[in-house]
Amino acid sequence: MNIFTEFHARIAAILRGIIGSGRLPEDLDLTRFVVEPPREAAHGDLAANAAMVYAKEAKPAFANPRQLAVEIAVALAEDGDVAEAEVAGPGFINIRLKPEFFGRLLGAALEQGSDFGRPATAAQEKINVEYVSANPTGPMHVGHGRGAVFGDALANLLAFAGFGVTREYYINDAGAQVDVLARSAHLRYREALGETIGAIPEGLYPGDYLKSVGASLAQAHGDTYRGSNGEEWLEIFRLAAIDGMMAMIRDDLAALNITHEVFFSERSLTRSEDGDQVAAAIAFLRDRGLVYEGRLPPPKGQAIEDWEDREQVLFKSTDFGDDVDRPLKKSDGTYTYFASDIAYHKTKIDRGYSVLIDVWGADHGGYVKRMAAAVKALSEGRVTLDVKLCQLVKLMRGGEPVKMSKRAGDFVTLREVVDEVGVDAVRFMMLFRKNDAVLEFDLAKVIEQSKDNPVFYVQYAHARVKSVFRQAATLLPDLDCSLAALKTADFSLLGDEGEARLIKIIAQFPRVVEGAALAHEPHRIAFYLHDLASELHAHWTRGKDQPHLRFIYEERRDLTLARLALVHIMAEVLASGLSLLGVSAPSEMR
């Protein structure tokens, strides 16, 4: 049960009654107001801004928003679940709910189990989440890891919310960087044959990770291509290097427990059985009057990618909010990267997705407008594109920057970080800051067993609540703690203020899940879990000094059973939230 949507519906019903009396317009949009937690807990359990939102429409029947708020509050006060509804300030409504209402919510949470928090109505949209899509030119670095974790957690969240989700990786296996990769692999191939290659020439990939590719090529081809012209071996080495790099990337992703259903090759856009899909996408836009031959004006004050003082094939991206029309072909007649991206996104639209989510590095921020323009044009406005930009990760150890990796050549690999601190620490910390904010990741801090380490703090909360049932089995061996018994618990016995705070945080979980899914912001789950863990640890500490507050109170078995039911629900919520983030929920931590 989402108590916020529940009371939104109840207030909407009150407003419909006022509409029926002729004092509000019949066409009033009842989705515009919100019901949310109040800014201060002392103000109640819910806050609604309906009277403020409809202040204009309320005149002349209501001289000001407060008058409308008073009428809504009076109607709410008659609701059997409302203890108090009062008007604050110019017209905000604060609502306090009866304990019995929260008792029913806890009962529903017990019934729903791991489904608690899942939106009640199944979503119909098909969503494509494309994430990672790192160039297959080397191992993944920590920046790639942030996008990988973000995309995977977002896909988990959307699937939990009922959307049809596809997890996709776009392999950038065409273009100049892949030729550079092939030439770098040829150098390592010659090295594997016994040549001394010395310093890696400028412009080639320097990392040791290509040595295994070179060795495989040497084993497969001997010295056939040692001194031959690049035209003879370039395609062979290109394919071998891409296969080797993608195998490495898949291993890196597996270390983070990340999988994709679809790996889509850029090369396939021009080499598939369907013919040249890039040409087809351009023709599609041309047929709609959105492609023309023309000249771009010179850039004003800033460089514009692909600008050349010549007649070019251009997409009318300015018709869809972009700053300048975009070239689709280079001077040598080959397609621009943007043209390939247009064709790729057209395949997503053709596959029936209504929402496309692209997870990119922040350095691609300047590319968002043109891609959004392309999706609008290709789908005629039917498909939504949401580009989520992931900011940099600053890798630290004890406050000092981490040195570069010899294996990668010029960066720290993701695998090195996962191997050092573990997958749970990497995943949680990558999500414990909003994706568009720079993240400082301290390798020393994330393995500390302290409240300053968020992943430990949340996992320890789960381990603590699971330990309560082990303690109950020892202290009260004849107490039935089965789920069936917990469902008979009397929640009206939970009268302590600390218990009430825990219950109210639990009640927010469905709202947090729904909001995070709709906003495409999985960090909200991490923040919520930290808040719940913090309240749990605080309540646990109070119980050390006040035995009657402990979850197991041997003198009151009925109260203990109610508290165990609360503990069970907390364990479910913590485990469910951690699962959405792709983080384990340990039952014990030593």
UniProtKB/Swiss-Prot annotation:
Disulfide bonds: none annotated. This is Arginine--tRNA ligase. It catalyses: tRNA(Arg) + L-arginine + ATP = L-arginyl-tRNA(Arg) + AMP + diphosphate. One of its GO terms (biological process) is arginyl-tRNA aminoacylation. It comes from Beijerinckia indica subsp. indica (strain ATCC 9039 / DSM 1715 / NCIMB 8712). The gene is argS. It is found in: Cytoplasm. GO terms for molecular function: arginine-tRNA ligase activity; ATP binding. The keyword Transport does not apply.
